[in-house]
Amino acid sequence: MGFALERFAEAVDPALECKLCGQVLEEPLCTPCGHVFCASCLLPWAVRRRRCPLQCQPLAPGELYRVLPLRSLIQKLRVQCDYRARGCGHSVRLHELEAHVEHCDFGPARRLRSRGGCASGLGGGEVPARGGCGPTPRAGRGGGARGGPPGGRWGRGRGPGPRVLAWRRREKALLAQLWALQGEVQLTARRYQEKFTQYMAHVRNFVGDLGGGHRRDGEHKPFTIVLERENDTLGFNIIGGRPNQNNQEGTSTEGIYVSKILENGPADRADGLEIHDKIMEVNGKDLSKATHEEAVEAFRNAKEPIVVQVLRRTPLSRPAYGMASEVQLMNASTQTDITFEHIMALAKLRPPTPPVPDICPFLLSDSCHSLHPMEHEFYEDNEYISSLPADADRTEDFEYEEVELCRVSSQEKLGLTVCYRTDDEEDTGIYVSEVDPNSIAAKDGRIREGDRILQINGEDVQNREEAVALLSNDECKRIVLLVARPEIQLDEGWLEDERNEFLEELNLEMLEEEHNEAMQPTANEVEQPKKQEEEEGTTDTATSSSNNHEKDSGVGRTDESLRNDESSEQENAAEDPNSTSLKSKRDLGQSQDTLGSVELQYNESLVSGEYIDSDCIGNPDEDCERFRQLLELKCKIRNHGEYDLYYSSSTIECNQGEQEGVEHELQLLNEELRNIELECQNIMQAHRLQKVTDQYGDIWTLHDGGFRNYNTSIDMQRGKLDDIMEHPEKSDKDSSSAYNTAESCRSTPLTVDRSPDSSLPRVINLTNKKNLRSTMAATQSSSGQSSKESTSTKAKTTEQGCSAESKEKVLEGSKLPDQEKAVSEHIPYLSPYHSSSYRYANIPAHARHYQSYMQLIQQKSAVEYAQSQLSLVSMCKESQKCSEPKMEWKVKIRSDGTRYITKRPVRDRILKERALKIKEERSGMTTDDDTMSEMKMGRYWSKEERKQHLVRAKEQRRRREFMMRSRLECLKESPQSGSEGKKEINIIELSHKKMMKKRNKKILDNWMTIQELMTHGAKSPDGTRVHNAFLSVTTV
């Protein structure tokens, strides 16, 4: 305790006051942070709290030091005498006070002498009387009984005795104790006054609650919580507060709320605080309308025990896991000195809960008070949030929902397929791309495709690694997801209504267009100028290729949503092969996409009305009715369980232990997709063959010569694309346009490549291409095409079927003029890879934004002629099973970084395996030249090249034999070296025999093939062995 301010004769500078006791510093001690306190106040605080009283930094008693200059300054201040109440008016310096008190005339002993009384000490039983200074009758022998003088025998010149001094010291000690007790009484009275104020406030709250009527579940209830600091922290965070002076937009949602509670902290008890508690008072200080800074200071300065009065909202339905389910809104928060962790309050929302704004955690220092405080408001059951902070405008377009998924065991899958975006660097969120229909998430029903996952179990998720780690945690059986979705996202019911209306209008327009086309037989002549321009544009190879690519990218991106729609239908439907409804959708969806991606394109004939006439010219009313039914069927299929938006990205399996099962499912899907695709293609090809044959048989007979040239060129091109075994690099290059088309459209048509000329569908495919080219050539008769070379071969081919077609293919192997070949290679609707993009450019205006225009017509034909072609389908399926190549799923990466899944033939893998096998067979048994040659390592030699190798080997063998014979003749002709020659010959023969033994042993040990053994062990006509024959490679 310091010196009381009342004792000083002059005003004291506030800098000389102690912050703990509020009095003038006595024996000042300074902390390492520069704060000065009284020694008697600071030492107990440092021992017990281990922290500076101003909460700035930790503190230890050994770190304190005295401030001697400050002590000297305080000692020079003038104070009043301790006996001022007795009449002493002197004021002396503080360091002279003790000497003055000892000799003050107003002290107890001095007062006796000044009244003329006896100056002797009080000894024995002598006690001075009230009326005079003489001794009582019990006085000593020198008393006044003998009539002596008042001084008695002590004498006048004597001072006070030792007893007098002892009594004086005793009196001073008692006075000091009395002053200390008075100070404690004052502090106790102040403390009880504060408690009384708190209790009165509680009583007023209770009275107000009781007077407000019966309490309903869901209202606020007051709670009183007593807290004590542990390690200088209370273990919870607060947010909110009344707007400060910088923010004049004050609302009724003021208040201080608990945002987070530290685990195992002082506030984390059964009777402690809970998240979203509204703090009303702290040690009697009202905080209901306080700012955030005032609340922080109140908790800092609060003395233990800290009594906190809170209002707590009781939920209508308490979840089983015992956590609060209140709504928490936060715009900005400031970290207080209560804890040092991030401030984050999660909103526990029930399924019907309205959207809430984004939850943005902040970690700010105490000096950062410029942010707007949090505005909080509680709502009843079905009320919507009407007042949002000004800073939350950017989050008004999103809807937030917290979903809890519980699983019985860790092996049970949640059923969520999540993906992350790579095309936008700013957006690094995790999105739900698919929900398994029979999973936990699907049964819950609150998570939709396209939802963004913000938090998992209260932890922010920024990348896929964090999401996989949290979702695949085996120990966690309860997963709480905070998801966000656009609030303006179209409702599924509204989409269905709009789609139905659009399809009705489209149906009427298409039927009207078909009728008009059927009634105008001269429509072909109207379309001729346009086709001539396109034909001229495709004459130049460079111009044609560039234009095709431009059309492909532009149209693909224009109708990107439609392409995504159809690709997502197929891929989503293929996920559940056991479902009947999904299987039916997959059947029709596959027919759509595959039929639209094969080489049987008829865009020009569709625009000119030729194909439409062939379908509807017989019975328009009946065909229109069937067409309308097909439209309705397609709408139902599209609206039942399919989704318009598909997020094309790489998926992340939540359960990483089932990779093998996924691969097995993909293999089954591949087989099923192939069967469905082949079946639909065969039906459509047979139908088009029959339909177009009936309508345009006379045209084929007139223009057969030109058609044969077109067909031959395309067949040769297809042969190059299919016979890809000898040129694996060229296959990727030639087929790149198909995948480029898929890239621009963000989807991949699921087509299956077939080997050429080995099955009935291949023959039908070629025939149908000729038919379509015949219609194209018929409309281009004005472009200089000659019709004098026409024959009746085409009609005979159509009548005789597949056998005649195979014969005609042999005749069509003749050479082509360069000009016709170039034209045929670059016609857009004859290209199997640019057909899907070129199709959009020639669709009528009323159907340009609806990609399934042509696919509906294909479906109509497929359904109409399905039953009549069952036998043909069975034959095609049997022939396709033995001829179709194996396909596999590939994950491809586009130029912008996005990924997509497509099916590629496994020919590359087969070629690699063949090369490795050849390399293994040739290892250790080839010649030195072949071993060192990099060009021949792993290369596959074709049949023609192997024939050339044999010819070269024979030529080399003849050359060596000739050289050997000439050498022997030279040796025989020289008699002078006869003996030496024989010796040399013997040495050569012996060395040859030795080498052949080693070589044969080596060859047999290294598993040399029979052909190579025969080649290396061959003998020349004169009996000598040939050792360096050219290596012959066996066929794998």
Curated annotation (Swiss-Prot):
Ranges of biased composition (kind: Low complexity): 774-799
Coiled-coil stretches noted in the UniProt entry, renumbered to this chain: 655-689
Region of interest called Disordered, as start-end residue ranges on this chain: 129-161, 515-590, 726-819
Record GO terms (molecular function): zinc ion binding
Transmembrane parts of this sequence: none
Annotated keywords: Coiled coil, Metal-binding, Repeat, Zinc, Zinc-finger
Any Pfam family hit: zf-C3HC4_2
Zinc fingers classed as RING-type: ranges: 18-56
Biased composition (Gly residues): 129-160
SMART domains linked to this entry: PDZ, RING
InterPro entries linked to this entry: E3_ubiquitin-PDZ_ligase, PDZ, PDZ_sf, Znf_RING, Znf_RING/FYVE/PHD, Znf_RING_CS
Biased composition (Basic and acidic residues): 548-566, 726-735, 805-819
UniProt biased composition (Polar residues): 736-750
Entries under PROSITE patterns matching the protein: PDZ, ZF_RING_1, ZF_RING_2
The UniProt record lists the keyword Transmembrane: no
Domain PDZ stretches: 224-314, 402-486
Name this polypeptide is given: PDZ domain-containing RING finger protein 4
Gene designation per UniProt: PDZRN4
